[in-house]
Amino acid sequence: DLHPHAIGERIGQTDYEPLAFGNGYDHNWALDKPEAGTVSLAAEAYEPATGIRMKIYADQPGLQFYAGQGMDGKEVGKRGDRHNFRSGIALETQNFPDAPNHDNFPSSVLRPGETYTQHTVYAFETDEQ
């Protein structure tokens, strides 16, 4: 079911092998692009307690979603905050993993003299309070 839902709502589903195997989300999602190479909405995250919304626009065919299950509190971030187990998420626009081994995937090969570019926009909004 790909309908919007809270991340924590399903992250512990041990009956769903991809979540159980990785102890949470670490998946690449194939985006439904209107046209290859165009910048379009890739993902949206919303925190109802703060009213903060993040929209991600990108020209990439995939989005890697990682939910921090590899964090153990040893890394320290801003203001001395520790990066603990599942204490954050990463949404990374990219090509498909293993693309060089699949002729039907967009190419990720960069040849000598070629230039690689990609465009990603992280846009933030807040609810009117």
Predicted features, each with a name:
Residues 1-129:
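Active-site pocket scaffolds in enzymes
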